[in-house]
Amino acid sequence: MTPSVLIDSDVLVWLTRGHEGAARRLQALPAWRISAVTYIELAQGCRDKADLARLKKGLAARNTEIVPLTEDISLRAAELIDQLALSHGMRLADALIGATAIALQATLITANVKHLSAVDGLSFEAFLPYPSMCNRGRSQIRPPR
């Protein structure tokens, strides 16, 4: 059985910028799953209706599951904000996406290691897009603590 993964917004942004490491990693996935928050962030980044149509077409081509927010996800995100906003700069979108991955028991593929590495119970795969991050777009996986 293929492990469950959730793709963070930042990795999809790298993909749209033509990053080969992002393309390679995402092509390896049999199916894509994103949080509703990720979809909203991507849609907000569209410049016009044609851009939005391309986004929707691209996500549909990959049979992307957009995971809706639930009460449990919202409550867990609020806990993450309480625990990590002041100490680690946790922001709303990151808390909601992290809480979604926890609720799904999915590994979150993300470049946002700074905020998400402190989240207990979150399994994440660090996508490191910059050569200065030591591994030129390859990933490192951390199981949940």
Model regions and ranges:
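Short loop/helix-cap segments at secondary-structure boundaries that form the rim of catalytic
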Residues: A23-Q27, K114-G121
